[in-house]
Amino acid sequence: MVQRLKAIYLEKAAPRLREMFEYKNVHQIPRIEKIIINCGLGEASQNAKSLDSAMKELSIIAGQKGVITRAKKAIANFKLRKDMPVGISITLRGNSMYAFLDRLINLALPRIKDFQGVSSKGFDGHGNYNLGLKEQLMFPEINFDQIDQIRGMDISIVTTCNTDSEGFYLLETLGMPFKEKFTKN
């Protein structure tokens, strides 16, 4: 079964992008390569229980288990030693990537209070888009009564685009609710 967002990409986004940017080859058409979800946990070095609950919540949201990221070097001011857990990272590809992006665009983002759209300034210069979320409660899979702490997360959408304008039109065609139209910085 083809994911709904992948079908939209194949039927609408790819032909639109090919026409807009005049690609000669179908392999030049930009596509989403992967989505990386990262959650930094400063308190994880002192509290192992928070690491477990954050791992459980992110696994429910993403649909796959995450990898614990560890400190590369010791920082005395943060009471941090080398190889202590400092966060969780999940990389999504293929169908799970399209399923997560579909839930993010259509279910999670509209549940944010006073949501006007995401900023179009989150592009990195190479067509990849970065988005920060302040809480995990916007995802319908998370039960409010079962969380111990509100945590934010960073979501990076990595594309094969060469420019930010290609990335903007790719995500806009897939339904990403941007606040404003794309303008070069």
From Swiss-Prot:
One Pfam family linked to the record: Ribosomal_L5
Matching PROSITE patterns: RIBOSOMAL_L5
Single GO molecular function: rRNA binding
Gene3D superfamilies associated with the record: 3.30.1440.10
GO biological process, one term: translation
Subcellular location(s) of the protein: Plastid, Chloroplast
Organism domain of life: Eukaryota
Assigned keywords, A-Z: Chloroplast, Plastid, Ribonucleoprotein, Ribosomal protein, RNA-binding, rRNA-binding
GO cellular component: chloroplast; ribonucleoprotein complex; ribosome
Job description of the protein: Binds 5S rRNA, forms part of the central protuberance of the 50S subunit.
Name used for this protein in its record: Large ribosomal subunit protein uL5c
Species assigned in the record: Chlorokybus atmophyticus (Soil alga)
Lineage summary: Eukaryota, Viridiplantae, Streptophyta, Chlorokybophyceae, Chlorokybales
Gene: rpl5
